[in-house]
């Protein structure tokens, strides 16, 4: 059984971040070590919420506790998702280095949560810059949506060919795999939910019917991808 250290958000009402990812990852056969970057009452798409952003040092202290009992060498992957602050990102990269020192085969899966194709960049100041400058080159796998792909590549992405080219530009900076988790307007059809997985040599495209969920779209599905 693979052990995944999942460092991302948590909501009490509903499901997002770790509260969305933990169950499906366990069902896929992974052992999840959830470490929350924020504890919110609900997802921010509701427009109002309560809760707190965890101090960056809290993340490091928790992981050090795992190291102190000799378990960090058994960590097979680190997943990072929603960040409450750019400072958290710096500590997460330190955790990635610590895990890889204990287990050189461990992978870093970065879900660079920054925005939404219809809403733009919606994260705390400095988070987008952190992902572009530091998380991208440190990651083994990175999973942007369309707007995040544009932010990371610094190019407009208008179609699938553009997306493949932008993904390959990211690969040249560090990651082995780029998973575009939602092509949105750059996909082949506005009636499909389309995804793209790109390596230096190959690219795979997959789609499914686009289901209309109304004003609040489901969130958190991509948070479980490291288990696959």
UniProtKB/Swiss-Prot annotation:
Pathway(s) per entry: Cofactor metabolism; pyridoxal 5'-phosphate salvage; pyridoxal 5'-phosphate from pyridoxal: step 1/1
Region (Substrate) residue spans: 44-45
Residues annotated for substrate binding in this entry: 9
Cofactor annotation: Mg(2+)
CDD domains to which the protein is assigned, alphabetical: pyridoxal_pyridoxamine_kinase
Entry's Gene Ontology BP terms: pyridoxal 5'-phosphate salvage
GO cellular component: cytosol
EC class (word): transferase
E.C. code: 2.7.1.35
Record keyword Oxidoreductase present: no
Keywords for the protein's UniProt record, in alphabetical order: ATP-binding, Kinase, Magnesium, Nucleotide-binding, Transferase
NCBIfam families: PRK05756.1, pyridox_kin
Assembly and binders: Homodimer.
Protein name according to UniProt: Putative pyridoxal kinase PdxY
Annotated organism of origin: Salmonella typhi
Lineage summary: Bacteria, Pseudomonadati, Pseudomonadota, Gammaproteobacteria, Enterobacterales
């Amino acid at each position: 059984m693979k052990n995944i250290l999942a460092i991302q958000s948590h909501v009490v009402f509903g499901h997002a971040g770790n509260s969305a990812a933990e169950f499906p990852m366990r069902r896929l056969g992974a052992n999840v070590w959830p470490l929350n970057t924020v504890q919110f009452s609900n997802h921010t798409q509701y427009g109002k919420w309560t809760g707190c952003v965890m101090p960056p040092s809290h993340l490091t202290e928790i992981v050090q506790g795992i190291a102190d009992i000799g378990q960090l060498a058994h960590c097979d992957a680190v997943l990072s998702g929603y960040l409450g602050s750019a400072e958290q990102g710096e500590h997460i990269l330190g955790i990635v280095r610590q895990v890889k020192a204990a287990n050189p085969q461990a992978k870093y899966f970065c879900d660079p949560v920054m925005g939404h194709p219809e809403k733009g960049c919606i994260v705390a100041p400095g988070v987008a810059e952190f992902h572009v400058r530091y998380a991208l080159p440190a990651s083994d796998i990175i999973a942007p949506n369309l707007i995040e792909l544009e932010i990371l590549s610094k190019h407009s992405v208008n179609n699938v060919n553009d997306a493949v080219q932008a993904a390959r530009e990211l690969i040249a900076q560090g990651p082995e795999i780029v998973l575009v988790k939602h092509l949105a307007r750059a996909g082949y059809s506005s009636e499909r939910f389309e995804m793209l997985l790109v390596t230096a040599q190959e690219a795979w495209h997959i789609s499914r019917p686009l289901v209309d969920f109304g004003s609040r779209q489901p969130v958190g599905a991509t948070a479980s991808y490291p288990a696959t």
